Amino acid sequence: EKKSKMRSQQLFNAVYKKNIKSFDELTTFGIELKSKIKNLISLDKPKIVDIQKSKDGTIKFLLELKDKRNVETVLIPDKTQSRYTICLSVSVGCYLSCEFCATAQISKKLVRNLSPGEIISQVILCKDYINDWSTNKQITNQVYMGEGSPFLNLDNVKIAIENSKNKDGLEYGRTRITVSTVGIGIKKDNIDAIEWAANALDVYLAWSLHSSISNHRSELMPINDKYSINSLIPQLKKYYEKTKLPIF
């Protein structure tokens, strides 16, 4: 067990810190072990189909996944153009149909959720693009505000965040990651999902409110008809009580 833990730490370090491109680079691993790892884990990243750059330095990537589905990832720079926030997608398509959302203009249905690897590989791909590994440019923050709703893919988002926070991995602090929610009051393991997320994710939470007037919010976000502002506030309070992190 101790040796397995050590090997796991070495593997995480190699993938997330040393940025290995092939498992053959695991020089301290035997041939048999490397063969097992190759059968279990892939280092493949999404294919970059298109890149758009704005005047302020924001970079939008159109990515192609293994099944030829597309998602978008965005890098948002600070004023120095050296520190970036990455906006991550968690699914292909989304059925929530929020009026202001670009995804809703493309797809009115959830095609499929992204795996933990597909989520975290967006970070690795963008780190490669700006050469985060060896220059003064860094992706310092993650926001789960791209395509799809994180609360409709909680299990995979949880694993991706755990890998991001792992000290042998990308080593992001809890205040460097923000998960957005439109306010989905579903149950998860017999408790409210927002309360579940407080324990399981333990990161900043951003509530996509857009209007405090219920009727107006329903026009913008149909999900408000099912999970109203008033029904969500107690859950959000519990999130704050457990994490002591402000909700945006």
Predicted regions and their residues:
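A short, flexible beta-alpha/helix-coil linker loop
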Residues: 18, 103-108, 212-214
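Conserved AdoMet/S-adenosylmethionine-binding subsite of the radical SAM
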Residues: 127-248
